[in-house]
Structures are given as C-alpha cells and as structure tokens.
A protein has these predicted regions:
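Nucleotide-activated chemistry modules centered on ATP-dependent adenylation/adenylyltransferase
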Residues: 1-305
Length: 305
C-alpha cells in the first residue's frame, strides 16, 4: 500500500476518532452498535483508538448487538470472541424475546425479522437510557445514508426526520438533545467500501470467515444466492447448488445474499471490490429491494441502519 493511500486512511481514521471523542464529551450514555460485520469491526477498532488506548483498555461504554435469531453462526462466534478478548461489556437485545413478550408479531418462523428488530433496538436504548448510539453506516452504501448527517437526530420515538437535520459546518457538531431524544452517530460516514477493506488490511483486523471464499449450499432466489439453513429452505422448483461464495455484507440469513468468489484473503477481496460496479447492498441485500425508499422508511421508524 502506497504512503499516499495510508495517509488518506489515517485522515479518515482521525475524522472518526474526533467524532467519537466529541460524542463522549457531549453526551452522557453512549453505546456502540455491533453486528459483527466488517463496518462495525472497523468502528470498534476506531473506538478503541479513540478511547481505549488502542485496545489495551476496555471501552468506557458498552457494545450492543440486536440478535434477530437469524444470524450467521460464524458471526455470533466471532462477536463473542472479539468482545470477550478485548474485555468490553456486551449487551445482547433479542428479537425472539420481543416476540415472546408480545412487543412484535412474527408472520412465520422463517420470515425476515429485519423490520422486527427496530422495536427491539428502541426498547434496549430506552431500557438502558442510552442517548447516543454509534453505527458503522457509510454514505456510499445507499441513497438514504448519503443524505444523513454524521449526527443523526432521533425524536422521543426514535424516529428520523430528514428535513429536521442540523447543519454540520467545518466538522462542528451540536449534540444538544431534550430528554428522551437520541442521536445516532456515524463516524465512518466518509469511508467507502474500498476504504473499509484497505483499513482492515492496514490494521490487520480479523473478520468472520464468511467474508472470504468458502463452499456453501445455496439457492438462487430473486437474483440472489441465499444460504440453505434452518430459516431458508428450497422452494418448489428451486435447486440447491454447492458454490464457492463469500459475503460482502453481514445481515440476516433470510435477506443476505452471497456473491460468487474465489477471494480468500483481504488483498484478493480488495481487488474484487475495486472492479465491482454494483454497491454491496444493491447486490446482496433483499431488505433494500422492497422499494427504492426501503432504507429511508426503516430509518424513519427508528432502525439502527
């Protein structure tokens, strides 16, 4: 990696570290949202650099994961090991518990729980009185994220109103909120997918194995390769194939598609990303295909994304 490229990554790193420290200085009870995906892994590393002496000390705020019950097992194993080894506090909010308590209603055990997790997240934020939540969202991912500020204000119901965003001139952030309001904070807003992978290479960060090429049973559905699992079974007329694939994003098994790939290292993934002409969410996330405004609708309802 050239020195110019490293300098660019260090500038992005410095911007993110500044945002994280600003939130801790202005807000009382922040939390870091962690999915076990590449973006949240980079975000965790940035938080450790900002506040945890580069990872030698536990963070002064907890890590929150919304467990839908439809997660990839490899990601859950990585989540537990990564947080445990660093000594951070992990809070797991369960969608299944929300279903059991009647907070949300599930159409069927194999249906997507993407919409349901919003209620679980909002309940967890309220129960722990968190007033700021760090997320790994990036502006290059999707149009709704492209127009969202670094400090994304949510009302007392956790909802986002795009027309009520505050200006952020010269990296000046206003974190004043009323009781019950929240801020979702996106320190990695200016990263691209390629920046994320290059930062992973620079910092030699460990990732869940699903990010690299492996053989998996999949079915082709609506133009995506979905992994056969306890929540994805072949429909009538669908064939099960064993294919060399990897994942560009981490979401639920029910909505996250794989891509054909032979990339087994960070360097080879970087080469694939450099040649890709389709965004990661556009290629692999069924939850963003329901409508052109699917992500914005979820944000307005209070989603973590």
């Amino acid at each position: 990696m050239t020195s110019t490229r490293v300098d660019q990554l260090r500038i992005l790193e410095a911007e993110a570290v500044h945002v994280i420290r600003e939130v801790v200085a202005e807000l009382e009870r922040p939390v870091l949202l962690f999915s076990g995906g590449k973006d949240s892994i980079v975000l965790l590393r940035l938080a450790e650099k900002a506040l945890g002496m580069g990872g030698s000390l536990p963070l002064p705020f907890p890590i929150l994961h919304v467990d839908t019950g439809h997660n990839f097992p490899e990601v859950l194993e990585f989540r537990d090991r990564r947080i445990r080894d660093a000594g951070h506090e992990l809070i797991v909010a369960s969608v299944q518990e929300s279903i059991n308590r009647g907070r949300v209603q599930e159409d069927s055990p194999t249906a997507s729980r993407n919409q349901l997790q919003t209620r679980t997240l909002l309940d967890a934020l309220e129960a722990h009185r968190f007033d700021a939540a760090f997320g790994g969202g990036r502006r290059d991912e999707e149009r709704a994220r492209a127009k969202e500020r670094v400090f994304s204000f949510r009302d007392e119901f956790g909802q986002w109103e795009p027309h009520a965003q505050r200006p952020e001139p010269w990296s000046l952030y206003n974190g004043r909120i009323r009781r019950g309001e929240q801020i979702r904070v996106f320190p990695m807003s200016n990263f691209t997918e390629l920046d994320v992978w290059r930062y992973i290479a620079l910092e030699e960060l460990e990732l869940p194995s699903i990010y690299f090429s492996h053989e998996r049973e999949v079915v082709s559905r609506d133009g995506m390769l979905l992994a056969v699992s306890s929540v994805i079974a072949p429909l009538q007329g669908e064939a099960v194939d064993r294919v060399q694939v990897r994942y560009r994003t981490v979401g639920d098994l029910t909505v996250t598609g794989a891509v054909r790939s032979d990339a087994q290292s960070v360097a080879s993934v970087i080469e694939e990303v450099k040649s890709s002409t389709i965004s990661e969410r556009g290629e692999t996330r069924a939850d963003d295909r329901t409508s052109q405004a699917a992500m914005e609708d979820r944000k307005r309802e209070g989603s973590r994304v």
